[in-house]
C-alpha cells in the first residue's frame, strides 16, 4: 500500500488538529457540572457517558494524520485508566495543554529535545510535590468522600465505602446489573486468584472478554493435562448434567486444550481452563483452600489419585465463577462451613507462628481469600442507557477509591495541580529546558480552568484567586464557593493525579519531538459500473 508522508510543521500541525478534536470532545465532561457525550453504537441504544476513556476510544477521524494525533491522546486516557482507573479526562486536558504550548515554542524555533527535558524535570518535581501534599485515607468517611466525588453520587460513595469495610481494602468488589431499578450492595462468600483463562475462545461475553459459568463443577488438580483421554470419562459424565466446568490445573496443553476449545466453540460443552495459582508448596496449599471452599478434592499423587479415575464426587461446585484474562473469581462455593472454619483457624495459627514477613503476607492473602468474600454492587436504573452510564461511573469511583487508599488523597477540583506550581517555578533551568518548565506551569492550571468553564465561570479569574489563596483552599465549582477542599470532601487520589500528569507529559513530549509522520494513503473509491441500457427493460 502506498504511503503518505508529512514532515516538520505540517506533520505536527496535522497531529495537533487530531489532539484538539479528541480533547475538545472529552473535556466538556470535566468537573461537577461537566456535560455528557452521546456515543452512537453499531447495535442497541446510544451510550450516554461522561467517562473520558470510553469517549476517547470511540473517536476515529477520517484524516489519517489527524487520527494518529487523536489515537495518541486516546492512549494517554487508556494508560491512565489502566494504572489508576480514573482521571482520564484530566489526563486528556493536560495532554492538550502541553501539546498546544509546546507546538507554539517549537514553531518559534525552540529545540524540542531541550523542551522535552524541561517537561520531564518539571513533571518529576510536580509529582514529588503532590506526594508530599498527600493525606492518608484510613476511615470509612474519607473512603465514601472519594467515591462520591468520582461518581457524583453520595449514595454510590456509601455503597463502595461499606463494601470495602466488609471485604477489606484489597477485597474483591464486582459490579453487576440489578434486576430492579434500585442500586444495592450484596456481600457473598467467594475467592479470587490471579490466573485467567488459557484461551480467549473460552469467553462467554465477547464485549467484556470474560467467561461466566453458572453453577459449574470445578476440577482441581496439580497435574498437567496434555492427553484428553485422561479426563474423557469425567467430561462425558459432566456432559450428561448439562453443567459447565472450570478446570484448575498445573497446565492444559498438547491435544487437550484445542479439544476443549473446539467443543466450547461448537457449543457442545461450556468449559474454561485456568492455571493453578501460586508456585511450589504454596500452590498445593492454595489448591487445598479452593477444594475446601468448593467441597471438592485435589487430584494429586500425594493422595494417590489419578485423573483417569476421577469422578464427579471429587469435583468442587460453586454458585458462579467469573474468569477474565487475568483473574478467576469463585462465588458461593459449596464447601462445608465447618471445614472452611477449621481451615481458617489453621491459617491463622500459621500466621502467628511464622517468622518470615513474606510468608506471613502470603498467609494473610490466603486468609482474606478464604474468609473475606466478594462484595457485589448491583446497579439498578430505569432504562438500559442510564444503567450503562451508571455502571461506568461506579467502576471509576471504585478504582479511584482503591487508588486513594493506596497512595492517599490531595485537594480535588484541580487545586492540587495549582498547589505544586511554586515547587515547579523554583526549578533552576535555562534555555529550552526553562521553556519546557514554563509549558508544564501553564498546563497545570488547565484542569481548574476547564472545570470553571464547564460550570459557567471565568477560568482566568478563578486561577488568579487560587494562586493567592492559602494551600488547601479551592473553588467548589458545584456551588461557586471558596472552601477548604479536603474539609468539604472535594478530593482526588494522588495516584490518579500523578498518573494523569505523567502519562500526559510522556505522550505530549513524543508529539513535540515528531519530525515526520507516515500514513497509509486512502484507497481510491472504486467507480460504480454504468448500467447496461438493455437491462433497463421497459422502465421509462
UniProtKB/Swiss-Prot annotation:
ATP binds at residues 29-32, 86-90, 413, 476-478, 492. It catalyses: ATP + H2O + a folded polypeptide = ADP + phosphate + an unfolded polypeptide. GO terms for biological process: protein refolding. Its main location: cytoplasm. Its EC number is 5.6.1.7. Belongs to the chaperonin (HSP60) family. Forms a cylinder of 14 subunits composed of two heptameric rings stacked back-to-back. Interacts with the co-chaperonin GroES. This is Chaperonin GroEL. It comes from Streptococcus anginosus.
Amino acid at each position: 500500500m502506498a504511503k503518505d508522508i508529512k514532515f516538520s510543521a505540517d506533520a505536527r500541525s496535522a497531529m495537533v488538529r487530531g489532539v484538539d478534536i479528541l480533547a475538545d470532545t472529552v473535556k466538556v465532561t470535566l468537573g461537577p457540572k461537566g456535560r455528557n457525550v452521546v456515543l452512537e453504537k453499531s447495535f442497541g441504544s446510544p451510550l450516554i457517558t461522561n467517562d473520558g476513556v470510553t469517549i476517547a476510544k470511540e473517536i476515529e477521524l477520517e484524516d489519517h494524520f489527524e487520527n494518529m494525533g487523536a489515537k495518541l491522546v486516546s492512549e494517554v486516557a487508556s494508560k491512565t485508566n489502566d494504572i489508576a482507573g480514573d482521571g482520564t479526562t484530566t489526563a486528556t486536558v493536560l495532554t492538550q495543554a502541553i501539546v498546544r504550548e509546546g507546538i507554539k515554542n517549537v514553531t518559534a524555533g525552540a529545540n524540542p529535545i531541550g523542551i522535552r527535558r524541561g517537561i520531564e524535570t518539571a513533571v518529576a518535581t510536580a509529582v514529588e510535590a503532590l506526594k508530599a501534599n498527600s493525606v492518608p485515607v484510613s476511615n470509612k468517611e474519607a473512603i465514601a468522600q472519594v467515591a462520591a466525588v468520582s461518581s457524583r453520587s453520595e449514595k454510590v460513595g456509601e455503597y463502595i465505602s461499606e463494601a470495602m469495610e466488609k471485604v477489606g481494602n484489597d477485597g474483591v468488589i464486582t459490579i453487576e446489573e440489578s434486576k430492579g431499578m434500585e442500586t444495592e450492595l450484596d456481600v457473598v462468600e467467594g475467592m479470587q486468584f490471579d490466573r485467567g483463562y488459557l484461551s480467549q475462545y473460552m469467553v462467554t461475553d465477547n464485549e467484556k472478554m470474560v467467561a461466566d459459568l453458572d453453577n459449574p463443577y470445578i476440577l482441581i488438580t496439580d497435574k498437567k493435562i496434555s492427553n484428553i483421554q485422561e479426563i474423557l470419562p469425567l467430561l462425558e459424565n459432566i456432559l450428561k448434567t448439562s453443567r459447565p466446568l472450570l478446570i484448575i490445573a498445573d497446565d492444559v496443553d498438547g491435544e487437550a486444550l484445542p479439544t476443549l476449545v473446539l467443543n466450547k466453540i461448537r457449543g457442545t460443552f461450556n468449559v474454561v481452563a485456568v492455571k493453578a495459582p501460586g508456585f511450589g508448596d504454596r500452590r498445593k496449599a492454595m489448591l487445598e483452600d479452593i477444594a475446601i471452599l468448593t467441597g471438592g478434592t485435589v487430584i494429586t499423587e500425594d493422595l494417590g489419585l489419578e485423573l483417569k479415575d476421577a469422578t464427579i464426587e471429587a469435583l468442587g461446585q460453586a454458585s458462579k465463577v467469573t474468569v477474565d484474562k487475568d483473574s478467576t473469581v469463585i462465588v458461593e462455593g459449596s464447601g462445608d462451613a465447618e471445614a472452611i472454619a477449621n481451615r481458617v483457624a489453621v491459617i491463622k495459627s500459621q500466621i502467628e507462628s511464622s517468622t518470615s514477613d513474606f510468608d506471613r503476607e502470603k498467609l494473610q492473602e490466603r486468609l482474606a481469600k478464604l474468609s473475606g468474600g466478594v462484595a457485589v454492587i448491583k446497579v439498578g436504573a430505569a432504562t438500559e442507557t442510564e444503567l450503562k452510564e451508571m455502571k461506568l461511573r461506579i467502576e471509576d469511583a471504585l478504582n479511584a477509591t482503591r487508588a486513594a487508599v493506596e497512595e492517599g488523597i490531595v485537594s480535588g477540583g484541580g487545586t492540587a495541580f495549582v498547589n505544586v506550581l511554586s515547587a515547579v517555578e523554583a526549578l533552576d533551568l535555562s534555555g529550552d529546558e526553562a521553556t519546557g518548565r514554563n509549558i508544564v506551569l501553564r498546563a497545570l492550571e488547565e484542569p481548574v480552568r476547564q472545570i470553571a468553564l464547564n460550570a459557567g465561570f471565568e477560568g482566568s479569574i478563578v486561577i488568579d484567586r487560587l494562586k493567592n489563596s492559602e494551600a488547601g483552599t479551592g473553588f467548589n465549582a458545584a456551588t461557586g464557593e471558596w472552601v477548604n477542599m479536603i474539609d468539604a470532601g472535594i478530593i482526588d487520589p494522588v495516584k490518579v493525579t500523578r498518573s494523569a500528569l505523567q502519562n500526559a507529559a510522556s505522550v505530549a513530549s513524543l508529539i513535540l519531538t515528531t519530525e515526520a509522520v507516515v500514513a497509509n494513503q486512502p484507497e481510491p473509491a472504486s467507480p460504480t459500473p454504468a448500467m447496461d441500457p438493455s437491462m433497463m427493460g421497459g422502465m421509462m
